[in-house]
Design a protein with these regions (language model features):
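N-terminal secretory signal peptides that target proteins for export/translocation
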Residues: 1-3
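Lipid interaction determinants
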Residues: 6-7, 11, 16, 20-138
Length: 138
C-alpha cells in the first residue's frame, strides 16, 4: 500500500512545481522598466538619450512616463500574450519628445501584445509583429 502512494506523492509534488513555475512567469513583469528602443521590429529606433521613458507593471495595471507625459492602463496576461485595455495619458506637448511619445503610446495601444523576456530585456511586440517596444529592467 505504501509503494502505491509514493508515485502519487511524487506526481502531486511535480504538478505543484510545474503550476508554481507557470504562475511565477507572469510576475517577472513586476517592477519598473526603462525604454531601450521602439518602432519597426526590423530596425527599432533607439530611445532618446536623457529622456526618462519608463513603464511599471503591477498586478494587472501599468503606468509610466514617455518624456513629458504620463500614461497608464490595465492588462491581463495569458502565457506570452498581453491583452491591454484602454491606455490613458496626459496631453502636454513637448516638441523634443513628441515623436517618441506618440510612437510608444501607439504601439502600447495595440490591444494584443506578444511578450518576450530575455535576461533584463523585455520585448513587447504588436499583435502583427511589425512594431516593438524594448525595455530594460531598472
Amino acid at each position: 500500500m505504501k509503494l502505491a502512494t509514493l508515485p502519487a506523492l511524487i506526481l502531486l509534488t511535480l504538478a505543484m512545481v510545474i503550476f508554481n513555475a507557470c504562475s511565477t512567469a507572469n510576475t517577472s513583469l513586476a517592477g519598473e522598466w526603462k525604454l531601450v528602443s521602439y518602432g519597426d521590429a526590423d530596425a527599432p529606433t533607439l530611445a532618446l538619450p536623457g529622456v526618462d521613458t519608463s513603464i511599471s507593471f503591477d498586478e494587472g495595471q501599468f503606468g509610466g512616463t514617455v518624456g513629458c507625459n504620463t500614461f497608464g492602463g490595465d492588462y491581463t496576461l495569458n502565457s506570452d500574450q498581453m491583452s491591454i485595455g484602454s491606455v490613458i495619458s496626459t496631453l502636454m506637448f513637448c516638441d523634443q519628445t513628441s515623436a517618441q511619445e506618440s510612437a510608444v503610446l501607439a504601439i502600447l495601444s495595440d490591444k494584443t501584445m506578444i511578450i518576450t523576456q530575455s535576461g533584463n530585456l523585455l520585448t513587447l511586440s504588436s499583435g502583427d509583429g511589425n512594431s516593438v517596444v524594448i525595455l530594460e529592467k531598472k
